[in-house]
Amino acid sequence: MRAEVLQIRWHYDANDDHTPIYSVDFQKNSLNKFATCGGDSKIRIWQLITSESSTKVEYLSTLSRHTQAVNVVRFNPEGNILATAGDEGTIMLWVPTNTPITTLADDAEELALAKEYWKVKIVCRSMGSEIYDLCWSVDSNFLIAGAMDNSLRLYDAHTGQLLTQKFDHSHYVQGVCWDPLNQYIVSESSDRSICLYEIQEEKKNPKKFQLVLKSRICRIEYNVTKFELISVTKPLNNDESSGISEPIETSNNNESPVSKHEALSSTANIVKDGSLERTEPPNSLNSKISYSLYCNETLVSFFRRPAFSPDGLLLVTPAGRLRPHGQPNFEVPYTAYIYTRGSITKQPVACLNGFKKPVIAVRFSPIHYELNSFSNFSFTSVSFNLPYRMVFAVACQDAVYIYDTQTCKPFYRAVNLHYSNLTDIAWNDDGNVLLMTSIDGFCSVITFEPGELGVKSQHKISLPEKRSASPSSIDDSQDNTAGGPATTTLIPRKVESSKVSKKRIAPTPVYP
């Protein structure tokens, strides 16, 4: 493994100063071609050239139609369309062209150096609210977008038409992802929750479907003993803490600590990280305590980018906070939660701990590998039973950790590459290159030697067949604008999922 910062002029303003880079994505079916975007309202296309001793970047093109900062770039699964969106609230779909199309925002010098050209084919317009994240459907027919007006919007990628919108979050939607099995859509918000929508087909018209809110996950519930009830309901003295410790990293504490005057009582419902909510009186034998799963809006990050695994069996969500059960005075560490397909509507089955700063993004490698024979402990014996390994990267604000679905600890970690917070990560097609972007205006790259991550598995992952789409593919007659789940009863899609043999009471901590 080799990690290095690529020190070139990525994105810059009129004063020639570096501007933040907010997103990166590799083009599918290409030779390490990727796109970046940032605070200069530009999108740039690059070619990554790797060798045994160094990594070089070649400039290819600049896309200049946006008028404000661009927050996300995403290539479609085929790699022939690039979707971009940002603060102006408009999604633009770009396609390659043989002739340059100039605009007033184009730079003559960059245009002369360009080696390829792109043009806007489709424009998806919204109500003008800033868009933080995008994701394509597996068949490239649709796009979902999370926005600053607390909305999740779905567009037809062929026409740009807004098909449906959901307002089930109470704060900014900072991350979205589409299930590879085409059954679910997930959004994550700074309201400390994730929303899971099911794509349900109509019985009479299989080409027509709608999004139905199946679950909104924001807290985890524990059964407590009488002793535990006394410990967490004890009144606070002037010299006692609230039972919620500040993180060890006090130099960059992004969460507001609970005031010592906020005593925990039988009716307490403190909306803070690691907060407690009682569901029964203290003397009840059935008393339960629930804890918030995710960071609140004080987290200093524009993005919370979740990800499905390529086979659709796992979902990993960032921006988690874990409160160990029975330890009210324990510090609340940052974490990323893992959901299996069987638990996706309920609660996480495991969590990845040990991060000094919040997790902001997760990305799975497109390659799956043969199982290692030397692993002494694996997720397989705890939660999963997969005939292959999948590799995924977890990006914190200050570091990147690389895991696989077989081992319980990260096997690579990259730290101290940037002065400012990370914003996005992306894998290339062969899974040997991981790019990361930062607010400091630079990109860094982690390069793996062929075979370093393992032997590629010959096991085939079956995904739904692609289908043709039309502007009427989504039924928007049941749009939920009031914040509750749709009440229309539809016949759900039949998608095979793993059965849960027992109910999990709490996530299983996995410490690096």
Curated annotation (Swiss-Prot):
Disruption phenotype: Viable vegetative cells but sporulation is inhibited. One of its GO terms (cellular component) is cytosol. It comes from the Eukaryota. Residues 239-257, 469-490 have a biased composition (Polar residues). PROSITE patterns: WD_REPEATS_2, WD_REPEATS_REGION. WD repeats lie at residues 16-56, 65-105, 126-165, 168-207, 373-413, 417-458. GO terms for biological process: DNA repair; DNA repair-dependent chromatin remodeling; DNA replication-dependent chromatin assembly; mitotic recombination-dependent replication fork processing; nucleosome assembly. Component of chromatin assembly factor 1 (CAF-1), composed of pcf1, pcf2 and pcf3. Interacts with pcn1/PCNA during S-phase. Interacts with swi6 at the G1/S-phase transition and early S-phase, but not in the G2 phase. The CAF-1 complex interacts with histone H3-H4 dimers. PANTHER family: CHROMATIN ASSEMBLY FACTOR 1 SUBUNIT B. Belongs to the WD repeat HIR1 family. This is Chromatin assembly factor 1 subunit B. The lineage of its organism: Eukaryota, Fungi, Dikarya, Ascomycota, Taphrinomycotina. The gene is pcf2.
